[in-house]
């Protein structure tokens, strides 16, 4: 049986009430907290017992310190003399436990406890969350603004959806943590004047939800990459994930190694920060070099094509699309699917002849019904110039057509106010919205084929 357990916990740095309760419950189950890090907490196997825990804060401490200062050590010795054993430290946090049934409390002055905790939070907790809040609000606002400007492009792209979701979650958790802390601090500061301790609040439930949402978004993004046929993209993603893990591991290893070597706080901080700047540049250059070498040697196939297009020129006429100039892009999320296909007959395109048959279509598959009208409006006004600055009489506008030949719910065709019809159509089906552009007048038979191929 393992004597160690590592867990990801959801207890805020300042929530000493929640920390003490949690450590007490874990001790009753036979697990004593041994170390705390930004990524996981480590517990050591012990005999199940009732232990009392006390979480205190030492504002002058730093995570770069090689060990406790003389003042800290004196405090630790005093605590040990009264039965409080130090089990671990984390930044300015100190965790003690006591096996006595009714131990003498370490914190007896509410005013000093509140102010000491506040000073400790100003060293790391508050600056970190203010930075995350600024970044989350800035990028989250940009993400939300883009949703209104280009919902199809954003909500159908796993990468954009993942990063946007992460930034919005970052803003939410930062606001919640900071608001919870300052509301508690104001209340605790007033109560302390009357000798009353106020329990710290918990945001654990929200933290769990946020983590699950981010994991789900990341899993969806990764699955989309792995299921694609793009070998080069898979290779780059694999290298970048390894790059991020390596950066965290190496930087943390440097910091911990310097602490074991008893390097001063200033030297440790300087070398660790230098590693944070230098390592990403070195590893990025290494990844680029590896990718280029693998590509040139033929290990990676850069001649990537998506799966077979659902509709080809050869389905509509006697044309060759084996070697044609074809664009076939596709990506999707749980909300939307998006595909763009552009094809010309290679017999003509290779000669550069302007009469080459040309076909281009965009398919938006709406998986979330509440997005349908939104997507339709975007696709409609990408071509329709009704609300543009173009003078009346020179605009391109959509006019409704008979949907029966297309087997659609609604069909619109682009029309010039100068009096001629374009060969661009907007086809609306139950779950799909399709914009298709020909360079010829499609026949009824071709319309039926389009419906059969694109909306089977």
Describe every region a protein language model picked out.
Residues 2-127, 145-154:
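Membrane-protein extramembrane domains
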Residues 220-254:
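Membrane-embedded alpha-helical segments of integral membrane proteins
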Residues 180-204, 252-268:
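Cytoplasmic membrane-interface regions of multi-pass membrane proteins
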Residues 1-10, 228-236:
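N-terminal pre-first-transmembrane soluble regions of secretory-pathway and organelle membrane proteins
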Residues 235-242, 298-423, 429:
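Short, solvent-exposed recognition patches
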Residues 435-456:
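Surface-exposed amphipathic alpha-helical segments
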Residues 120-193, 204-223:
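Core alpha-helical transmembrane segments of integral membrane proteins
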Residues 261-295:
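Internal/C-terminal transmembrane anchor helices
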């Amino acid at each position: 049986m393992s004597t160690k357990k590592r867990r990801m916990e959801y207890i805020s740095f300042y929530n000493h009430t929640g920390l003490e309760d949690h450590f007490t419950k874990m001790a009753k189950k036979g697990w004593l907290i041994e170390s705390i890090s930004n990524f996981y907490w480590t517990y050591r196997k012990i005999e199940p017992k009732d232990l009392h825990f006390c979480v205190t804060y030492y504002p002058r401490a730093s995570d770069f310190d090689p060990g406790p200062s003389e003042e800290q050590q004196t405090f630790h010795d005093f605590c040990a003399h009264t039965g409080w054993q130090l089990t671990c430290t984390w930044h300015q946090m100190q965790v003690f436990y006591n096996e006595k049934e009714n131990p003498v409390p370490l914190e007896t002055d509410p005013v000093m406890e509140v102010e000491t905790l506040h000073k400790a939070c100003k060293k790391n907790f508050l600056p970190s969350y203010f930075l995350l809040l600024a970044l989350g609000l800035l990028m989250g606002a940009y993400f939300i603004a883009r949703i209104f400007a280009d919902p199809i492009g954003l909500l159908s792209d796993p990468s954009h959806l993942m990063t946007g979701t992460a930034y919005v979650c970052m803003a939410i958790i930062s606001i919640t943590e900071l608001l919870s802390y300052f509301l508690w601090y104001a209340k605790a500061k007033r109560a302390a004047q009357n000798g009353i301790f106020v329990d710290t609040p918990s945001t654990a439930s929200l933290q769990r939800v946020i983590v699950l949402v981010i994991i789900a978004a990341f899993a969806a993004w990764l699955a989309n990459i792995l299921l694609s046929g793009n070998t080069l993209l898979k290779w780059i993603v694999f290298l970048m994930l390894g790059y991020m893990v390596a950066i965290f591991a190496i930087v943390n290893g440097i910091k911990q190694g310097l602490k074991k070597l008893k390097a001063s706080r200033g030297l440790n901080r300087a070398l660790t920060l230098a590693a944070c700047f230098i390592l990403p540049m070195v590893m990025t250059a290494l990844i680029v070099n590896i990718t280029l070498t693998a590509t040139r040697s033929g290990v990676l196939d850069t001649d990537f094509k998506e799966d077979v297009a659902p509709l080809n020129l050869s389905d509509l006429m006697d044309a060759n699309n084996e070697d044609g100039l074809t664009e076939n892009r596709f990506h999707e999320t749980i909300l939307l699917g998006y595909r763009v296909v552009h094809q010309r007959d290679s017999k003509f395109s290779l000669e550069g002849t302007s009469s080459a048959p040309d076909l281009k279509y965009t398919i938006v598959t709406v998986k979330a019904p509440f997005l349908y009208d939104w997507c339709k409006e975007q696709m409609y006004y990408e071509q329709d110039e009704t609300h543009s600055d173009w003078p009346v009489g020179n605009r391109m506008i959509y006019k409704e057509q008979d949907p029966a030949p297309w087997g659609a719910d609604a069909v619109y065709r682009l029309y010039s106010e100068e009096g001629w019809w374009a060969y661009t159509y907007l086809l609306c089906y139950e779950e799909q919205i399709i914009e298709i552009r020909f360079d010829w007048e499609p026949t009824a038979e071709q319309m039926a084929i389009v419906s059969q191929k694109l909306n089977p």
